[in-house]
């Protein structure tokens, strides 16, 4: 009898548990690894969305040194980009003209800004006045020739192709019609930024700068319309090395501008076709360098290498006012071939960071007391290109 009662009691307890008399066990909390895997899966699903189902957006592109606005969406889109190749005569420097081959009428071509996972649809037109076919090789594209074959376009024709921006970074695009070096040397290059899905940190000012080397028949400064010199190009002996296609393109009245206390980001490219750039801003230290436009970040950098056909992103805070000179620190290129730019910064002086000259006394020899102050001797006259540098 006792055994029957015990069995009945156990059975009733199991019945109560089955009917919810006991609280249900909670599912284990999601681990960070599981959350990351779920996020990755969601991103992969978005990346695999057929391009025909994506929202369509017309790209906002900009001429240098302006930069398109940051991406403010959290989903992929089909981004339509229109490009036109134009061959035109423009000023290389005062009194010197050159027949440039361009994307959209200037050197560099327009800057393009898209988001990782976007499908980029390119409508590529070659102006009827062009003398040769042109195309575009996007270093941001994965696939045959970066789109060069798909965009090979005769004068007066338009071609269309698309690619998916699979990997974030800052990439060069350039013409790749033979002779490739000649097309690039005449100015056919630009930058496309593929923002990571999470975006880039906010900064106060952004600028677009591309270095290039030019090969004219005449020496630097020789007046008139200067033709391209293939022999100099093959020998890698440029007469001009410049930022944004022209001597003084970002100097003097065209200088970049910022205010003390602002953080500046520069998207720096090197169209080449031959030279590697040693990019430096005199009087500044780069807080961050996105090495070769990729994911790796170096900090506290004085100068950074920008390879031909490559790029870098540099960021720095301008603490005090002044005129900061941008150079290729292969320094004869700066002072003798044109690779000079300016960032003019306004604001209040801060002597805690740097003072003006505090004294000027006559040299008295090692260990001797300073001699009486005397008027400073006149310095040798600076060349026109050096007057605003230091």
Curated annotation (Swiss-Prot):
User: What's the cofactor?
Assistant: Cu(+); Cu(2+)
Residues in Plastocyanin-like domain copies: 101-195, 245-346
Give the cofactor note text: Binds 1 Cu(+) ion. Binds 1 Cu(2+) ion.
Query: Which SUPFAM superfamilies does the record associate with it?
Result: Cupredoxins (SSF49503)
What does the entry list as the binding residues for substrate?
139, 280
Q: Give the residue numbers of the N-palmitoyl cysteine lipid attachment.
A: 19
sequence-type repeats, residues: 371-375, 376-380, 381-385
Query: Where do the record's region annotations for 3 X 5 AA tandem repeats of A-A-S-A-P lie?
Result: 371-385
Signal peptide location? 1-18
Task: List the protein's name.
Answer: Copper-containing nitrite reductase
Q: Which organism is it from?
A: Neisseria meningitidis serogroup B (strain ATCC BAA-335 / MC58)
Q: What gene name is given for the protein in this entry?
A: aniA
């Amino acid at each position: 009898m006792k055994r029957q009662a015990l069995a009945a009691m156990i059975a009733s307890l199991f019945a109560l548990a089955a009917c919810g008399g006991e609280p249900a066990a909670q599912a284990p909390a999601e681990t960070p690894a599981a959350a990351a895997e779920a996020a990755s899966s969601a991103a992969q699903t978005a990346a695999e969305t057929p391009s025909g189902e994506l929202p369509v957006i017309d790209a906002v592109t900009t001429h240098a040194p302006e930069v398109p606005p940051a991406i403010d969406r959290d989903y992929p889109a089909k981004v339509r980009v229109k490009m036109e190749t134009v061959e035109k005569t423009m000023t290389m420097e005062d009194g010197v003209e050159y027949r440039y081959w361009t994307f959209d009428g200037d050197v560099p071509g327009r800057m393009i800004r898209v988001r990782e996972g976007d499908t980029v649809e390119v409508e590529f037109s070659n102006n009827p006045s062009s003398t040769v076919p042109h195309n575009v090789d996007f270093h941001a594209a994965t696939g045959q020739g970066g789109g060069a074959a798909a965009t090979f376009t005769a004068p007066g024709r338009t071609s269309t192709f698309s690619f998916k921006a699979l990997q974030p970074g800052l990439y060069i695009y350039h013409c790749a019609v033979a002779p490739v070096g000649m097309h690039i040397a005449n100015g056919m290059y630009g930058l496309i930024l593929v923002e990571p899905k999470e975006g880039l940190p906010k900064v106060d000012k952004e600028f677009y700068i591309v270095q290039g080397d030019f090969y004219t028949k005449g020496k630097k400064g020789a007046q008139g319309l200067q033709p391209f010199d293939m022999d100099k190009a093959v020998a890698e002996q440029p007469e001009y090395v410049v930022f944004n296609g022209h001597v003084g393109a970002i100097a003097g009245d065209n200088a970049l501008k910022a205010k003390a206390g602002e953080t500046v980001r520069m998207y720096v490219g090197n169209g080449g076709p031959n030279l590697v750039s040693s990019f430096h801003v005199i009087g500044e230290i780069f807080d961050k360098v996105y090495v070769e436009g990729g994911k790796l970040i170096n900090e506290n950098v004085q100068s950074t290498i920008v390879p031909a056909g490559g790029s870098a992103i540099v960021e720095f805070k301008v603490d005090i006012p002044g005129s900061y000179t941008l150079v290729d620190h292969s320094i004869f290129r700066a002072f003798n071939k044109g690779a000079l730019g300016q960032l003019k910064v306004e604001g209040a002086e801060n002597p805690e960071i740097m003072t003006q000259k505090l004294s000027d006394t006559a040299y008295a020899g090692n260990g001797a007391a300073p001699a009486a102050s005397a008027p400073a001797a006149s310095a040798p006259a600076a060349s026109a290109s050096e007057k605003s540098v230091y």
